[in-house]
Each structure stands twice: as structure tokens, then as C-alpha cells.
Amino acid sequence: MNKQLSGFIAILFLTACAVQKPEQIISVEDVGRLIKTLSSDEMEGRGTFTPGIDRAAKFIENEFKQIGLKPLNGDNDFRQDFIVKRIKPQTIQATVNGKIIDQQNLLIISDLPSSGFDQSSGNKLILIAAGDQFIQKYREITAMKTPVLVLVDNQHAQMFKRLKDNSSRGRIVEKQNQSAAAMFILGESDAANYKVSFSNMIEELPLFNVAGMLPGRSKAKELVLISAHYDHLGIVKDVDGDAIANGADDDASGTTAVISLAKYYKKLNNNERTLIFVAFTAEEIGGFGARHFSSLLNPDDVVAMFNIEMIGKESKFGENAAFITGYERSDFGEILQKNLAGTDFKFHPDPYPTQNLFYRSDNAILAALGVPAHTISTDQIDTDKFYHTVNDEFETLEVAIIHATIQAIALSARSIVAGTDTPKRIPKLNSRP
């Protein structure tokens, strides 16, 4: 740790003590212990639906128990169980104008166990032409509620193949759409006569968030969320003898922050608002943990969400700095920065607007419901060569950076936790995500 960073930490805690008089309970050693454990090979990359993520969940549960958090209202423990379904195509057949279509040119997107239709069914026929935006069209079509036949120009063959490969591994859904079926056919431009049929294998799979709380004092009904996702990619393609995507920065670093902040606020024991600490599952495959969590509460009760993602390395702005996604969408960042007055640490607006980071983490699920939900990060995402690789390991991180960022979050959140500041709401979407 260099002198400048050490000096910041000293200033940070002197300032904090002057305001809240907390004990210095977030230590570099404990931060290192947490992140090293969560990103160890024993956790096998914390892949969704694997024994590794179960081991990680048990570790987080035990930390919450030792800290003294309480389960969420109505729960008996810290594990928040729910079920999703994985849908894999088993059989798929199509005949167009008397010609049997090759399997590699067929893609079915449907939650139905099996079905079929032909030109007499009165279903829509849609063309995705050479100049069309394929992904935009794909999203619109798969959101439809009725069966549809889609003819795809060969110009989109590469993206078609990618989607077909993804589908063959299985799509994860929360709820089955019992009426829709989109049959995509590559390389055909006319279908005066057609007949298609398919069948899917559908299996139920368990998922689980880990969540605990510190009940508020005078404003217990007002909730502050402190979150990170604890899943990663699991076992991936072998690279030089290593196939474990440990996910040290993504997002064992954020999960470490959640545990550390829980310990910090439990020790202070003066939060006026209720604090909920949650480690989300399945962020990497679609944000299913955050989606389930958001369905269990009234989003209007959530005052703010501190989502913490990848804080393991120096930011683009140098030491003593992090950025906040969606900074301009509320005054959340301004409140945090105000509370850091007198320290060297600064929260900046997201410097990577083209990366759409605001929409790429669990905060987006709550933000869509009107919550001032933002992600705090230090990652230089445009140049991070370890992101989503087997090399995202503990040894690549700077624990002093993580430690300083966690303490900055602890101090900057104080007025929101105390109930004296309330960030402006974010405009809701028309429907729940």
C-alpha cells in the first residue's frame, strides 16, 4: 500500500469517527480473507446450478450468521430459494414449399413442451431481411404471445448460429409462456406452404440468493439495499491447464464488500432505515436472482440500492476513486460525494457510456421499478484483459484498493442509512422487467 492510499484511509476514518464514531472494523486482512475464499478453486468458479455456487452460498450464510444479521421478514434462514426452468430443444422439424429444411437452419424459441403449426393455422409470417437489425427483430418476435414463422436472410447466418448454439445449451426462464412459439428458418425467403413441429425438454432447477437484514430504528419501513452478485461462469474451456473462471473481481470483490459492510453497520448499530444485504445469484445468465428478489418487495419502499461490482483494481481515475453507473439519473452520486467531503476519495460518473454498464448488472432490475439503484465499480472494462476469463484470480487484485473503496462506501452512505438524505427516484418502466 502506498503512502497516498494509506493517508486516505486514515483521513477517511478520522472523518467517519467525527461523525458516527464507528470502530475500525473493516480490516485489510479480513477483506483479503473473504475474497480469497470466494474466488478459490474450491468454489469452482461459482457457476450457476453447480456444487461450487452452493459452497459459496454456505460460506456467505455463515458470515451473515456470525455477523448477527437477521433473516428477511418471513424467512427462517438467509437462503432465498426459488425455482427456474431450463428449456432445451429436443426435436425440431420443418418443411417449406415441399422441401425438408436442414436441422442446422432451424431455431425454435418456445416454452411449450411440444407443438406444431402450418400455413392453415393463421399464424404470422415475418421476414428478417438483409438490412434489418437482427437482434432487435429477434427480441420483438420472441416477446410475442402467439406462434410465428420467421424467415431469416443468409446475411444473418453468423448471429443465427450463435443464437442456435445458445438455445441448444438451454434457455432459463422464470415462468413459462404457454402459448408462444417462434420458429426461425435461415435461408428461405418464401413460405407459401409450410409445416413445422418441435419438442422441448423442460427441467426445474433450484436457485438461491443469500440475504440478511439489520432492522431500522425510526424508519424501519424504508429499505436500503446493499448488494452484489456472487455467481460467476464456473468451469469453462481449458486454457493452459486452467478451466476455472474464479471470478475474483467479478464479483467476489463486490460480495466481499457486502459482507464487510454488513459487519460494519452491525457494529455501529445505529441505522435508522432497514438495511438489506443481499448476494444475488444468476446475474451472469440473466439477472434471475435480482428479478426474484424484486418480486418479493414493494419497490416504493426501497430508498436506494448500492450495487457493488468489480472493485478489485485501480480505476481509470487513479487511486481513491470509483465510478457510479447512471450517475445522471438521480442525485445518489451527489449525496455520496457530499458525505466524502474532507477525504481524498471521489465518486465519478461512469466513464464508459458506450458499454451500457447501468443495464449490465443487477441494479437495472430495481432501477426499472423506480428505485435509485446504481452500481459502484472501479473496473477499467474497456481494457480489462482478465474479465470473464480463467485469469480473473485473487493474485490479479489490489486488496488495498478494495479495502479503501469499501470504507468509502461505508462513509458515503451514512446520511442515506441515517434517513437524513433520500435520493431522487428513477422513472419507472411501463412494466416489471
Q: Which ranges hold each PLM region?
A:
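Noncatalytic luminal/extracellular "stalk/propeptide" segments of secretory-pathway proteins
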Residues: 44-140, 146
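N-terminal hydrophobic or amphipathic helices/low-complexity stretches enriched
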Residues: 17-71, 214-216, 221-223
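Soluble metallo-hydrolase cores and metallopeptidase-like ectodomains found primarily
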Residues: 165-247, 263, 267-272
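Second-shell loop/turn segments in exported
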Residues: 21-25, 41-51, 81, 124-129, ...
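Metal-dependent peptidase/peptidase-like ectodomains
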Residues: 270, 280-384, 424
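Active-site metal-coordination/substrate-binding segment of hydrolases
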Residues: 103-150, 221, 227-257, 261-266
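Bacterial Sec-dependent N-terminal signal peptides
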Residues: 1-26
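His/Asp/Glu-rich mid-to-C-terminal helical/loop segments that flank catalytic regions of hydrolases
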Residues: 383-433
